[in-house]
Amino acid sequence: DAGYDMLNCDNGTYDAWYWAHPPGYMPENCNLEDVEHIKKFVDIPVVCAGRMTPQEGASAVKENKIDAVGFARQFLTDPAWVTKLMEDREEDIKPCICCHNACFNMAHYEGVPNIQDMDDTSNMSRCALNPMTMQSKKYKIVPARVSKSVAVIGGGIGGMETALVAAARGHAVTLYEKTDRLGGIFIEAAAPSFKEKDRNLIEWYRRAINNSSVTVKLNSEIKR
């Protein structure tokens, strides 16, 4: 009666803002049950958002529990994720870990540092895992003028990202890790049961390294 065409629903409020964009410690599909209930009382399309998984979302739409699913942060991490899903390449999707470290760049609070003060990031949402998000014209991986032999010391997330970018530019890269596996301190950080996306990210990087030209040396501590 009010003239709304659609309801895009979540449980977020000014006092519980995180329900609108659940962080990593909240369950996946945590808004779905309540949004399904809303659909029973309206005759316009109802959309559910908030850490929705494609599988659960598709099932809910198929069963007419909701009309559509809302996704946002995953597009910032991997803009091609829907294409990869359609091509049955889900393992190639770089996962959003729901960290809020860059996508909430636009959420400014007095007294809190924020890169909105920088001209090239003002009014732009970013991604901690994808520096090219909203900055594709500024950050590009271009072939190196001279191919070099590059040693990357440390096989954590930062080391693996560095190795992948250097290899993509045409350098011969060797990645040295003193332990028997890649992941670094992020392995411990991803240990809590609710951090499944963090563990998925480690596996994504390991797979990306394995599929690249990077040479990996495990159990290889580099000393001065």
Spans of features found by a protein language model:
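Phosphate-coordination loops involved in phosphoryl transfer and adenosine-cofactor binding
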Residues: 146-150, 219, 224
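Short gly/ser/thr-rich secondary-structure transition/capping motifs
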Residues: 132-137, 214-220
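Flavin-dependent oxidoreductase catalytic cores
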Residues: 1-153, 157-173, 181
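Short hydrophobic/charged patches on amphipathic alpha-helices used for structural packing
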Residues: 57-58, 206, 224
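Beta1-alpha1 glycine-rich phosphate/pyrophosphate-binding loop at the start
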Residues: 1, 152-219
